[in-house]
Regions:
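Structured soluble/peripheral alpha/beta segments that form catalytic or ligand/cofactor-binding pockets
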Residues: 3-5, 11-18, 25, 29, ...
């Protein structure tokens, strides 16, 4: 990116919507760190066959790439919901992922919700053996003992069955697909990942928190990521990710990846008309403050960020709705998943919105 602000044309964006979109950028479709060119999946080949011959190549497609992937080290389906039930606000995160940590393959089911009654975050993560779950490679059908996902982008059924939280939601795509870094390729700790988002999915259904039922409606950000992990991943992993939804309709997917002495901070801005802008971000660590220490794990996390994007003349203050939003992991991959509020300036205009901030790694 090297200080560039990249904007794709409306013609190319229309092609993206027709073909399911695109994401993440490495030069000429290659791994920016290794030079290897990723092998195209059947979904990618379908996009290439029917897509535009101009502009950046597309490596993801919304519906075809919902299915589970064979031969990858991680396969993730991530839902962030901003919901209302009457005057009650519920911020929900539900995540299903296949991982290959050093101790062997594991399936993680995770949920986190801000309880409208107590105002506190309730979260739970459960881990399963592969044999206890099913992941279809023919259609979206991810099932674990704690729930799963099925359907397609126009009618996605998301369920969760946890000790204190039950989730039953229907999601429907509205608006364009967000393609991180323009093609769908995300250089990630020396290897290649694929990633895209449907950041404005109409959402209805029910959530039960500690026995209290809520009929809910609102908007969800669905994020899909899969790919390989370099051998060094588990030793080096440390990142901040933000999914920012602004009230003006803009959506921002922001990564700040720390890999040893290297830090790569960048964002993809999606406008309501489908235009994408790829921009550099000032590293988040220097403006991250208000450290919170978890009583459960002893981990320390920043809980106040200033997002500075010079190319957009943007300065956004991001603060969690409550500080205590750690998700404790049975396999030790503890993380912070903070439902947050956003306010600031962009392109000379005031903006507000909401976000989720994910912190993974050692923040002590």
């Amino acid at each position: 990116m090297a200080g560039k602000r990249t904007e794709r044309s409306m013609e190319e964006r229309k092609m993206d919507r027709n073909n399911g979109g695109s994401k993440s950028k490495a030069p000429n479709g290659a791994n920016a760190q290794t030079g290897a060119t990723p092998m195209a999946s059947p979904a990618v080949q379908a996009v290439a066959a029917s897509g535009s011959s101009k502009g950046a190549p597309l490596f993801v497609a919304a519906d075809p790439d919902l299915v589970a992937k064979k031969g990858v080290a991680q396969d993730s389906w991530f839902v962030i919901s901003h919901l209302m039930s009457g005057s009650d606000r519920l911020d929900l995160l539900i995540h299903y992922i296949r991982l290959t940590p050093p101790q062997g393959d594991v399936i993680q089911a995770m949920v986190s919700v801000l309880d409208p009654v107590s105002g506190k975050s309730i979260s739970e993560e459960r881990d399963y053996k592969v044999s206890e779950t099913t992941f279809s490679t023919a259609s979206l059908d991810v099932q674990t003992p704690s729930g799963g996902l099925s359907g397609d982008a126009s009618a996605m059924h998301v369920t969760g069955r946890f000790q204190r939280i039950d989730v039953d939601l229907m999601l429907a795509q509205q608006g364009p697909l967000l393609a991180n870094l323009g093609t769908g390729l995300l250089p990630f700790y020396g290897d290649i990942n694929y990633e895209y988002a449907l950041p404005s999915m109409k959402t209805t259904g029910s959530i039960v928190v500690d026995g209290k039922a809520y009929q809910v409606a609102g908007v969800s950000w669905f994020d899909r990521q899969w790919g390989q992990m370099a051998p060094s991943f588990w030793a080096h992993m440390q990142w901040s990710w933000m999914g920012i939804s602004l009230d003006n309709g803009d959506r921002i997917s922001l990564w700040d990846i720390i890999d040893g002495d290297k830090e790569h901070a960048f964002a993809t801005l999606l406008h309501p008309d489908g235009r994408h802008e790829i921009v550099d971000v000032e590293p988040l660590a220097k403006d991250a403050t208000s450290i919170w220490k978890s009583a459960a794990t002893g981990h320390r996390y920043p809980t106040h960020w200033v997002v500075s994007i010079p190319m957009l003349k943007a300065r956004l203050r991001v603060e969690p709705l409550v500080r205590e939003q750690e998700v404790v992991s049975p396999i030790g991959v503890n993380k912070y998943e903070g439902a947050s509020k956003v306010a600031g300036q962009m392109e000379g205009k005031p903006v507000t919105g909401h976000a989720v901030v994910e912190l993974v790694g050692d923040w002590n």
